Each structure stands twice: as C-alpha cells, then as structure tokens.
C-alpha cells in the first residue's frame, strides 16, 4: 500500500553476519531477490564503513518523486562493528517538469466540450492543488476523481469533494466509461 500511495519508505532488513553467509545456514535466503520486486532501490552494505553512506543514499532514494521504496540490507556485523564516519544525505533531484506540449493538449481537451475526468493523486490531493483542480473543473466541466489509494487527502469544510476510483477493476471501468478523456494530476 505504501508503494501504491507513493509514500517514501526506507526498509532496513537484518541479515546474517557477512562471514556467516558462506555457510548457507537453514535461515539464509536471497533477501535482495525477495526485496527487489517490492522496492525501487535495494542495497546490501558490505561492511560497517558503508552503512552510513548506504543509509543516506537509501533516504535520498526514498525521497525521490513521487515517493519510493528503498530497502537497505544490513548484515549483523555491519551494524555492530565500529565505523569511523557518518554521511550526509545526498541532494534529491527536483521532479521533472511537465512537457509544455502535454499542457497545451490538456487545455485543448478541457475546452473541447467532450467528457473529461481529472484524476488526482499524490500531491494533487493537497489543499492548494485541490483548489486549482476545483477551479479547472468549474470552468471546464471536467469531473474530479481521486485514485483509490492515497497517502494523504486533504478534506473538510470548504474543500473540493472527490470520488475515489474503485479498487475493483470492473467497478473502476464503469466509473471511467462515460469519459472520452482522462487527465492525470499526480496520479
């Protein structure tokens, strides 16, 4: 659910000590292989000196837009051995800007008079974005919906009301069927 909601998460997973892994004990498993399908970034620290740098990198990876899952695997000895220094979290690149041609196409579609759904997700569900989406919907006739899974949706008095797209595919198709155009904002 964290991945669906684009929530930044750092998982720290314990592993056998580096010198014990070669013995292939009964509880030894391919943690990287297990973590990879559910993580955007996976790294195993090889020694105590790498833990702070790898940890800082895991934080930076999780902070990337739109929110990612980073898994850092720490063999036991990397966690209990001494390290000589810490690390600074690397800067995170700014999110990509929207292509101006895509914006022009959205404007064209919104002005077309054809049925348009504006599907909001992630930061599109925050107060400022909701306010803008409400204005766009009011002036264009677009209908607002939100994703079925969201980390946070700002609601309450004076906020724009949204209908969530159902999680069940058949129901979601029924909701989207009347629309000729779908514009994604954070979704």
What is each residue range found by the language model?
Residues 1-187:
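N-terminal alpha/beta PP-like core and its mobile active-site loop of ThDP/TPP-dependent enzymes
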């Amino acid at each position: 659910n964290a991945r669906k909601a684009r929530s930044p998460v750092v998982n720290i997973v314990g592993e056998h000590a580096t010198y014990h892994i070669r013995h292939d004990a009964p509880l030894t498993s391919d943690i990287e292989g297990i973590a990879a399908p559910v993580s955007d970034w996976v790294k195993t620290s090889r020694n105590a000196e790498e833990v702070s740098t790898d940890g800082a990198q895991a934080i930076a990876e999780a902070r990337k837009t739109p929110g990612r899952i980073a898994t850092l695997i720490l063999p036991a000895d990397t966690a209990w051995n001494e390290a000589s220094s810490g690390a600074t979290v690397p800067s995170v690149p700014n999110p990509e800007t929207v292509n101006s041609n895509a914006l022009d196409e959205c404007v064209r579609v919104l002005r077309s008079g054809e049925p348009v759904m504006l599907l909001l997700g992630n930061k599109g569900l925050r107060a400022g974005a909701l306010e803008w989406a409400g204005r766009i919907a009011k002036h264009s006739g677009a209908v607002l919906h939100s994703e079925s899974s969201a980390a946070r949706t700002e609601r309450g008095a004076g906020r724009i009301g949204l209908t969530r797209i159902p999680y069940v595919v058949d129901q979601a198709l029924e909701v989207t069927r009347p629309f000729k155009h779908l514009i994604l904002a954070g979704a």
